[in-house]
């Protein structure tokens, strides 16, 4: 059973500069909620309850976002706003599930995942790249279900336009594999 997720967050975020020189892209709000929270909520809904965040020294704001109890308590004390109280409760729930690993030099995704080796329990985990947000269905739940059927590694992919090829990783598949899982 898959209960852990690795989430690499140490990237430089250069495509969104200059905004990401101030705010990590993972904390950029989408409809009032940081991107990384969408990932956490989807994973929790899929049964994952342990997260390993890979960050760099330049991404301390991510750690601060989730572990800034003193700030929340100070605000709640001054202003008894139910929305803020609810946010704090949600953050406290996340705190129990998150561990941090540092990747101080950008040596790629493989290096980042290798840094998590000591924290991985068992042989199975999810790795979620926070660059693309999939709103439609719970992709994590679907991937776990497919993994349980196939008992092999699963990769979520999407078809892209030729104009976007330079910004993406390419994956070539055989026709037989395409037909099997369509």
Predicted regions and their residues:
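Conserved beta-loop-beta/alpha segment of the NTase-like Rossmann-fold superfamily
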Residues: 64, 72-75, 82-169
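Conserved hydrophobic/aromatic positions in well-ordered beta-strands
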Residues: 28, 169-171
């Amino acid at each position: 059973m898959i209960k852990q997720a690795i989430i690499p967050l140490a990237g430089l975020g250069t495509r969104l500069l200059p905004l990401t020189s101030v705010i990590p892209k993972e904390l950029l709000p989408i409809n009032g909620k940081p991107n990384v929270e969408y990932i956490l909520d989807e994973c929790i809904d899929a049964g994952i309850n342990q997260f390993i965040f890979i960050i760099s020294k330049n991404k301390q704001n991510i750690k601060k976002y989730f572990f800034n109890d003193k700030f929340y308590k100070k605000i709640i004390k001054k202003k008894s706003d139910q929305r803020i109280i609810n946010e704090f409760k949600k953050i406290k729930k996340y705190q129990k599930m998150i561990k941090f690993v540092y990747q101080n030099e950008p040596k790629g995704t493989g290096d980042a995942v290798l840094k998590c080796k000591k924290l991985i329990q068992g042989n199975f985990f999810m790795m979620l790249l926070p660059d693309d947000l999939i709103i439609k269905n719970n992709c994590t739940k679907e991937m776990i279900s497919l993994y349980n059927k196939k008992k092999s590694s699963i990769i979520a992919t999407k078809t892209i336009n030729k104009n976007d090829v330079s910004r993406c990783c390419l994956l070539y598949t055989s026709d037989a594999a395409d037909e099997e899982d369509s």
